[in-house]
Curated annotation (Swiss-Prot):
Main subcellular localisation: cytoplasm
This protein's domain notes: The last Arg residue of the ACP-binding site is essential for the weak association between ACP/AcpP and FabH.
Description of how the protein assembles with itself and partners: Homodimer.
InterPro entries documented for this protein: ACP_syn_III_C, ACP_syn_III_N, FabH, Thiolase-like
A molecular function GO annotation: beta-ketoacyl-acyl-carrier-protein synthase III activity
Catalytic activity field: malonyl-[ACP] + acetyl-CoA + H(+) = 3-oxobutanoyl-[ACP] + CO2 + CoA
Family membership noted in the UniProt record: Belongs to the thiolase-like superfamily. FabH family.
GO cellular component term, pick one: cytoplasm
Protein name: Beta-ketoacyl-[acyl-carrier-protein] synthase III
E.C. number: 2.3.1.180
Region annotation (ACP-binding) ranges: 251-255
Length: 323
């Protein structure tokens, strides 16, 4: 059976690094307060002339180089983002053009912080169905553009960046020993839409708006739902948490990550962590973490990975894949 295996990874982080201390003369906060509650120490902000597509193109180029492929060998581009350059056309078509591609298809996918997990499931389905042999997946965000800089409960959390993964079709035996994506689990529940949202939009206010969040409630849902979705995906793959080599979580908050790992009975030594250096980069966080860990040589062939995320909607999900 056809499997979607990881051929390459790449990422890009803007040059501007913002330490927690930057917020101290703007808000009633401190480096110690932010670290204690989130685990975040710094984050990157895009330059004024950088758009989400610019970040995505640079991450895509890095992933293609890691895969040893040219853009002409890619069949589809999927970009997960909540901060597009424009209402339309899609960021994906801008990346497609930026890479010099004149073929294939490209589209955006919006599931906020869960976006890259949804994108992985989309790409897996395309490859399994024979609609594409190679898919370039990108998570790219410029959340600094939608921050309310007077709200210390949100503006200290987020950063900008992009990560990319090249998935490629390969033949497997149809067993849990195969390389590639083995199972996915996607969920959403719109009754919780007011827990995490942006208070602007084309059809409502005609403005970009600012991010709003009921942090305590989001935290509770995240701790419950992330471990549950990971367990469901593992069960679908015929696997158990004790077989997991690496948990690659959405990098929202260290306390959420620790609680999820505890519920899965995984030691923190098996968890990929980038939240301290990147902050919450929404849909970019999982591909950023994958790329950083891959560049460090942490993943070995045959390693079993679980990626999970939750975001506005609420939308959440997980992917089980073998490296």
């Amino acid at each position: 059976m056809r499997r979607a295996i990881v051929r390459g990874t790449g990422h890009y982080l803007p040059e501007r690094v913002v330490e927690n201390s930057w917020f101290e003369d703007k808000l009633d906060t401190s480096d110690e307060w932010i670290r204690a509650r989130t685990g975040i120490e710094r984050r990157h902000f895009a330059a004024e002339d950088q758009r989400t597509s610019d970040l995505g193109i640079l991450a895509a180029q890095a992933a293609l180089a890691d895969a040893g492929l040219e853009a002409a060998q890619i069949d589809a581009v999927i970009v997960a983002t909540s901060t597009p350059d424009l209402t339309f056309p899609s960021v994906a078509t801008m990346v497609q053009a930026g890479l010099g591609m004149r073929h294939g298809f490209a589209y955006d996918l919006q599931a906020v912080c869960a976006g890259f997990v949804y994108a992985l499931a989309n790409a897996d389905a395309l490859i399994r169905a024979g609609l594409a042999d190679r898919v370039l997946l990108i998570g790219a965000e410029t959340f600094s553009r939608i921050m309310d800089w007077t709200d210390r409960g949100t503006c200290v959390l987020f950063g900008d960046g992009a990560g990319a993964v090249v998935l490629e079709a390969a033949e497997g035996q149809g067993s849990s020993a195969d390389r590639g994506i083995l199972a996915t689990d996607l969920n959403s529940d719109g009754q919780y839409r007011d827990l995490l949202y942006v208070d602007g939009g084309v059809a409502s206010t005609g403005t970009a708006g600012h991010l709003r969040m009921q942090g305590n409630l989001v935290f509770r849902h995240a701790v419950e739902k992330l471990a549950d979705t990971a367990h469901r995906a593992l069960d679908r793959a015929g696997l158990t948490p004790d077989q997991v080599d690496w948990l690659v979580p959405h990098q929202a908050n260290l306390r959420i990550i620790e609680a999820t790992a505890k519920r899965m009975h995984l030691p923190m030594e098996k968890v990929v962590l980038t939240v301290a250096d990147h902050g919450n980069t929404s849909a970019a966080s999982i591909p950023l973490a994958l790329s950083v860990a891959n560049a460090e040589g942490r993943f070995k062939p045959g390693d079993l990975l679980v990626a999970e995320a939750i975001g506005g909607g609420l939308a959440w999900g997980s992917v089980v894949l073998r490296w």
